[in-house]
Amino acid sequence: MGVAVIAAVATVLGAAPASAAVDAPTAPSSARVLPDPIDCEGCWAPDPSTTWQWQLQGEIDTAVDVQMYDVDGFETRPSTVRELHEAGRAVVCYLSAGSWEEWRPDAADFPRSVKGAKNGWPGERWLDIRKLGVLGPIMQARMDLCAAKGFDAVEFDNVDGYRNRSGFPLTGADQLRYNVYLANQAHRRGLSAVLKNDLGQIRDLLPYFDVALNEQCFQYDECNRLRPFVAAGRAVFTVEYRLELHEFCPQAAELGFSSMRKKLSLRVWRDPCP
């Protein structure tokens, strides 16, 4: 498909053709040694009621009446970020941190050794997240780009490779180390960190991430796993692709989520919960 929405569509269809999710429980907390969280004083900390738009394809429509936009970090122009800021909106930088995408301008920076199995969509492969010496500088450069364009936060996509047939023997502990690294690096740049999916590690990652974003937790009856973010007073943004509003909005309101319905293409169209 040649755009960032590929990863979102893979999630929507559940088990991707070449990369079906597998059970891979995380290691016990006592077995992990994680670095301390890096504070992000003054960073964007949205209210749980924040309204939002998620557009990863097409020319950004800046006229949607919401408080936050989540848009592609590479393709969105700095002028668009400025325009949204001038309208009083926060702007989140979408990056795929766990997959290689052949159309990205830095695609040649990824050596063959870190590119694993296809994730089921043309031009994408899982990354060997254990190799921070290789991936770290690339991801830092991407976050530098987000900061230079004026974004307020980073949405890290595909950060649950340990639960998929990635082509590497990734463990839950590997994923935790990588995700913590990403969040801390975002905070070093004054960017809030948005955790995408990875429901199985929420309790461990809560000290590091400022916001949660989830796809289809109502469809798969997984939304209760996001309660730690709610209890901490942090925003939880959720999207459903197949359910009608009446099938999830009452529960979303009860849980304190900011939820909406989107089409798989992740273009302008949105249907928010009332």
What do these predicted regions represent?
Residues 1-23:
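Secretory targeting and sorting signals
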Residues 20-32:
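Polybasic, low-complexity, intrinsically disordered segments
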Residues 29-274:
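Glycan-processing catalytic domains of CAZymes
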